[in-house]
Design a protein with these regions (language model features):
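Conserved polymerase palm-domain catalytic core
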Residues: 18-181
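Short helix-capping/linker segments at secondary-structure and domain boundaries
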Residues: 11-18
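Glycine-rich active-site/cofactor-binding loop and its immediate structural neighborhood
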Residues: 4
């Protein structure tokens, strides 16, 4: 646990400054009420249709290979990458037996929130590139649009992006378009 905390501190220093200012989860001086304030301000400007996207079992389904590739773009020390990979695969105890983990992030681990933000940073950058107004808090995303039709198109295109490019599943039952009053 101590090694994970130390690793998280070093990675936080390297990554946090490059995260989107629309990413609010697990970050210094960024809280859920800040995300709410951003969305409220957008609604006051006429953006009244929200895409509420839920990523299905996000922490349990993060692709290790993809995450390691993302980390390797910034971290050039192979020993650090190897250490993180070992932490990811360290396993879970099931019926007294330790099983190595092939996918997912350990929930409650000191490194997991930061790794989650690193993994989802690509989604934030894509939303910014497309000019969307959004707020993301951990694995919860709200994207706000001017019309219902725009919101429905946005939900469809983001679902494709998340599933095809980021290799995550969107929870269709919990993801929807709603009017913001």
């Amino acid at each position: 646990r101590l090694v994970q905390q130390a690793t998280a501190q070093v990675l936080d220093w390297a990554y946090d400054r490059d995260f989107s200012d629309r990413s609010f989860g697990f970050r210094r001086n960024m809280r859920a009420h800040h995300a709410l304030r951003v969305i409220t301000a957008e609604a006051d400007q006429g953006y009244r249709w929200a895409v509420d996207m839920d990523l299905a079992k996000f922490f349990d389904t993060v692709n290790h290979s993809r995450l390691i590739r993302k980390l390797s773009l910034k971290i050039k020390d192979g020993r650090v990458i190897s250490l993180i990979h070992k932490m990811l695969r360290s396993g879970v105890q099931i019926n007294g037996e330790i099983k190595p983990t092939e996918i997912g992030l350990m929930q409650g681990g000191p490194l997991s929130p930061l790794l989650a933000n690193i993994y989802l940073d690509e989604l934030d950058k894509e939303l910014e590139k497309r000019g969307h107004r959004f707020a993301r808090y951990a694995d919860d995303l709200i994207c706000i649009c001017k019309s219902r039709r725009a919101a429905e198109r946005t939900l469809a295109s983001l679902t494709r992006f998340v599933q095809e490019k980021i290799l995550l599943k969107v929870n269709q039952e919990k993801s929807h378009v709603a009017y913001v009053s």
